[in-house]
Each structure stands twice: as structure tokens, then as C-alpha cells.
UniProtKB/Swiss-Prot annotation:
Protein name as catalogued: 4-hydroxy-tetrahydrodipicolinate reductase
Entry-linked InterPro entries: DapB_C, DapB_N, DapB_N_CS, DHDPR_bac, NAD(P)-bd_dom_sf
GO function terms (MF aspect): 4-hydroxy-tetrahydrodipicolinate reductase; NAD binding; NADP binding; oxidoreductase activity, acting on CH or CH2 groups, NAD or NADP as acceptor
Gene Ontology biological process terms from the UniProt entry: diaminopimelate biosynthetic process; lysine biosynthetic process via diaminopimelate
PROSITE patterns referenced in this protein's UniProt entry, alphabetically: DAPB
Enzyme Commission number: 1.17.1.8
Family membership: Belongs to the DapB family.
Gene coding for it: dapB
Classification of source organism: Bacteria, Pseudomonadati, Pseudomonadota, Alphaproteobacteria, Hyphomicrobiales
PANTHER family in the record: 4-HYDROXY-TETRAHYDRODIPICOLINATE REDUCTASE 1, CHLOROPLASTIC-RELATED, DIHYDRODIPICOLINATE REDUCTASE
Species this protein is from: Rhodopseudomonas palustris (strain HaA2)
Signal peptide: none
Length: 271
């Protein structure tokens, strides 16, 4: 079987460079395209050199339609506007679209859902094995404990992160809500400030911290009468997300059209 040909979207960014490095380390995949935003000063530069590798001859381009003509998939950790633009082209080309972009709105998610009748999409707020195991455990614990245990999710990221709560925190919140059998949107408490009143029973709280160079720390706290359960994950290098994205792309290659998650990729969907 020939290598899976992949495009890295946002190839000039931190995650894009990590993806380029991960591809160079992984058997069965090859970098065939590097996408960057129109007008970027990085256009035309070599993706390998930008990632701290020897030159690989793949220059950054803003033309996804041309890049995708000879590709099998795209790895997309960009921003919502770029991801939604990429969704349409990936669907037209019939290539695998792995989406790790965070900060997507409900309307963005509706657009992604609409293309999955003919497109293969793997979407997750976090691509690492550890976080998805944490989500599975969160769901199980939430199922087992009653409303007398309050659920709080605390996350910390580097000072440059532009969205909050993080996609991973929301992933964990969805897992907790699923375990409780409730809708997260109607049970979510975010950004408490001032005279907020007592905590509502059944709420799932979020706290977001920003500072330094933290790759990503997440804790799920179940606070009950006179005892607490804490589940936590600390990411030490964004390469864990890059290798997870590659695992997702290879898993999805040849699958039927649909919207999949890392839980599907890792066999945790029924956990």
C-alpha cells in the first residue's frame, strides 16, 4: 500500500510545524502539501526548514484546491474561519479531513456536520490518547456519582492561546454531561465573577488559566460531601497531538463518509 499523502494546514504555525515533524517520523505517511493563509510572509518557504528539518521541497502555498488534487488527507489545526473554508474543499476532493481546530461555534459545527454525508471528517478538541482516556473516565465517574458531587473543570494554557475554555475542557465537559445524561450548554457555568450567588446543583463549571508556555493542563474535579475525586492530564509536548492526528488520518483513510471522533479512532466510543 502506498503512503498516505497529507497536507498540513497552518504549516507555518507551532502546531503545523509539529505536524510536519511528526509526518517525517511516521511510517506510511508523506507530506504532499503545506497550506498557509493568503498574504502570509511564510508563503513560498520550505515546510521542512520551517519545522527545523532538512529541506523537503514542499513550499507553503495558499491554494488548497491545487494542493489537494494529489492528496489523501488534510490535518487542520488552524482557526475557525480557515477550517470552515477548508471543509468545503476537502469534501469536494473526497479527502480525509482531521480537524483539531478549537473555538468552533455551533454554526461552524453545523457546517462541518452538513458535509459528512460525502466527506470523512475526524474532529476532536484533543487528539492525544491520554486526554481521550481522561474523557472516558470522566464520563464513567459522572455516571456513577449523583448530583451531590459538583463537577468543575480547570484548564491552563500558554499565554498566547486565544480561545477559552479550551477545546479539551469542552471535550471533558461534554463527557461529564453525557455521563450525567444532560445537555452541556444548559448546565455550563463559565467565568464566574462578582456576586454570583450559590452554585447551582447540576452545573458543570469551567475555569480557564493563561500564562507562560504551558502546553496544556486539565483537571476534572468531582467535589462531594467531605471528599473530592480529581482526574488530571498534563501535556508536556504538542507532539502528542501531532502523532494523534496522524493516527486519526491513517485510521480514517478508506472509511465510509461520516463524522468521527478520537474516541472512535481509539476504540473508546463505547467505554
Amino acid at each position: 500500500m502506498s503512503d498516505m499523502r497529507l497536507i498540513v494546514a497552518g504549516a507555518g504555525g507551532r502546531m503545523g510545524r509539529a505536524l510536519t515533524r511528526a509526518i517525517s517520523e511516521t511510517k506510511g505517511v508523506v507530506l504532499t502539501g503545506a497550506l498557509e493563509a493568503p498574504g502570509s510572509e511564510l508563503l513560498g518557504q520550505d515546510a521542512g526548514v520551517l519545522a527545523g528539518l532538512p529541506a523537503n521541497g514542499v513550499e507553503l502555498s495558499a491554494d488548497l484546491w491545487t494542493l489537494s488534487a494529489n492528496a489523501d488527507g488534510i490535518l487542520d489545526f488552524t482557526v475557525p474561519g480557515a477550517t470552515i473554508a477548508n471543509v468545503a474543499i476537502a469534501a469536494q476532493r473526497g479527502i480525509v479531513h482531521v480537524i483539531g481546530t478549537t473555538g468552533l461555534s455551533s454554526s461552524d459545527n453545523a457546517v462541518i456536520q452538513s458535509v459528512t454525508r460525502q466527506a470523512i471528517v475526524v474532529k476532536s478538541g484533543n487528539m492525544s490518547l491520554g486526554v481521550n482516556l481522561l474523557a472516558a473516565l470522566t464520563k464513567r465517574v459522572a455516571q456513577s456519582l449523583g448530583d451531590n458531587f459538583d463537577i468543575e473543570i480547570v484548564e491552563m494554557h500558554h499565554r498566547a492561546k486565544i480561545d477559552a475554555p479550551s477545546g479539551t475542557a469542552l471535550l471533558l465537559g461534554e463527557a461529564a454531561a453525557l455521563g450525567r445524561g444532560v445537555d452541556l450548554d444548559s448546565h455550563s457555568a463559565r467565568g464566574r465573577d462578582g456576586l454570583t450567588g450559590a452554585r447551582k446543583t447540576g452545573d458543570i463549571g469551567f475555569a480557564s488559566l493563561r500564562g507562560g508556555t504551558v502546553t496544556g493542563d486539565h483537571s476534572v474535579i468531582f467535589a462531594g460531601p467531605y471528599e473530592r475525586i480529581e482526574l488530571a492530564h498534563k501535556a508536556e509536548d504538542r507532539m502528542i497531538f501531532a502523532h494523534g492526528a496522524l493516527k486519526a488520518a491513517q485510521w480514517a483513510h478508506g472509511k465510509k463518509p461520516g463524522l468521527y471522533s478520537m474516541m472512535d479512532v481509539l476504540g473508546l466510543a463505547e467505554f
